[in-house]
Amino acid sequence: MTLGEKICTLRTGKGLSQEDLAAKLEVSRQSVSKWETGQSVPDLEKIIKLADLFGVNVD
């Protein structure tokens, strides 16, 4: 499973839209979409915020 697939799975599991997640991370919805489709990757700060938000470790 890619990082993007994990983000998408965790996001949908929490019932969040891409816009909801983007607002929580203070990024654009397009950024979230690009992460989920593998067109880009979040920076370390955002990865840490994602881990905290979803209650997972960064591994």
Functional labels for PLM-detected ranges:
Residues 12, 23, 52:
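Alpha-helical residues within the helix-turn-helix
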